[in-house]
């Protein structure tokens, strides 16, 4: 079976490996090299690096909307196109090129969290579980029928990065299962998504990372987890702007104004919130690296309870 794989970030690498394990991946599509790092030199995507290491031809069109790019894909004579976090829109004409259409690995239990940031939004919302769907693509945004799915519980300590890694591996497994069925001559049953329960996982914005102490501590703790490793939550702590890499919510009937330091010790720095308190455990000062609350307190001798 001739497979064309389309993906860009690290999340897609596990799925590329799964596709290449027992099938012929005739080409990989990924986004063009982008400026990265302090030197802002052009850097290849993680998927491109994996494809090059495997000797798979790589294509990097700016768009798949023009006729030349579509003909290039058509010339590959794909039986199936697998799309995982590619980042480019696939027009209807592209969806119709492969014999079996285009499959997408999506990191949520559709129709919940359609869109760009399903992993982080699931944590932010306090969802007890998430998962991966293998979807038959159509023109709408993540609206296609689901071929296979697998659930995954969200641990109370999961960060966005940790859940990302779990779902990347789960996505590869679900894709492998689907490809195995197709190779055996069994096309998975396409089940339309329910009309109820649709939510959208909008792209992360750095402005969202700014914590408001007037909010509920549980919600703030979830944001800290969801936004680690990017964009990392930030807040003002006793007059200083800090980034918060790790925090937990506490039940506290404090009666203090939001943002007040309630306690400070080796276990963390407790901050009054609109409801409850947030214990800051890992922080980062501007220009510095992430450090424990104990090390932060050693550096900020001026920090006082009640500030």
Curated annotation (Swiss-Prot):
Q: Which residues bind (6S)-5,6,7,8-tetrahydrofolate?
A: 108-111
Keywords from UniProt, A to Z, are: Protein biosynthesis, Transferase
| One Pfam family it belongs to | Formyl_trans_N
A GO term from the CC aspect: cytosol
InterPro entries on file: Fmt, Formyl_trans_C, Formyl_trans_C_sf, Formyl_transf_N, Formyl_transf_N_sf, Formyl_transferase-like_C_sf, GART_AS, Met-tRNA-FMT_C
Recorded hits in NCBIfam families, A to Z, give:
fmt
The record's annotation in HAMAP family points to: Formyl_trans
Biological role stated in the UniProt entry: Attaches a formyl group to the free amino group of methionyl-tRNA(fMet). The formyl group appears to play a dual role in the initiator identity of N-formylmethionyl-tRNA by promoting its recognition by IF2 and preventing the misappropriation of this tRNA by the elongation apparatus.
Protein name, UniProt field: Methionyl-tRNA formyltransferase
Q: Which organism is it from?
A: Stenotrophomonas maltophilia (strain K279a)
Q: What is the lineage of its organism?
A: Bacteria, Pseudomonadati, Pseudomonadota, Gammaproteobacteria, Lysobacterales
Gene transcribed to yield this protein: fmt
